[in-house]
Structure formats: structure tokens, C-alpha cells
């Protein structure tokens, strides 16, 4: 919208700015998928924030350090900024590894987004589906995940969140989660579009 474009136009610190304005409103999905694929086509490392994510200033340094440290470690798929426990007790380091993640502020590499299956073709492969069902059961992951992927494919839209999770599951990917939460989500209220309290 016009307000968002004005914010970008008013950036006053030294940096290179790239614009990718859609001529048509596609809605959240597939717009987020399209924007992320575009951003990762320009850079091999990116930090992704949605319009309602408010990061702590330390989030950027946290991402920069870990993007560099784990750049060539293919076990790591993403760096999360959100920790839903706010503070994770009994962990002495600044972060820990997990098999799931939140999309409320994250960073990753092109090598990861290159693995994304925009068309959900894994749904047509019996061996992939057997593995996916086993992973969902073993890791106690969302029981409705396969159903969500099927619905997203039926809608003909690339929903990056399910695509990203499927990619992590199939590639045994890990996320890095900060011991202390670094993201406040202004859209996480009872009357929000994508959030139910």
C-alpha cells in the first residue's frame, strides 16, 4: 500500500534498497512466498520480517552472526527470532536447536529456499508420504499438516509456511531458536486475521 511504500522511500540510513511491488493484490499467500523467493534470488542470506513483527535490536546481530557461522552447515535450515516460551530455562547458551520454528521473524539462506517445493509434489510420492507420516508421528508434529498441504495445493497457491516446514522435515533440517524471545508480534491479538487467542 501507499503507506508501506512511503516508509521504504524514507529510509535514511546508508544501504542498498530493492523494491518489488506487486501490480495485483494476491493476498498473503502466495505473496509471501513470491516475495521471499525474489529476495533470496538477490542475496544468499536474508532476514525476513512480516508487517506485524517487531524485532528487538539484538535480533539483527543475532541473525548476522549465525547466518555467517552456519552458512555451510546444511543441517541448519533457519534462524528463528521468536521463542514462544519467552525465556527457555536450563539452557546456558544464547540459542538451542529445534525441529520446528515460528515464522515470526526469521533468517535463512538461499540454499534452503532452493529446496522449497512450490507445487507440493511430495504429496504424489508414496515413499515421501510414508516418510512424512512417520516423521509427523515420531516428532509429535501437527496431525493436520498433510491435510493443510493438500488444501494449499488445491487452492493453487504457494503457502510458504507449509512448504518451508515440509522442506525441513524431508531434509532433516534444524532451526535455531533464541533462548530469549526477540520478536513481538503486533498481529497476535484476539481480533487478528491469522491468530486465534
Positions of predicted regions on the chain:
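An acidic/histidine-cluster motif and surrounding catalytic segment
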Residues: 1-48, 53-197
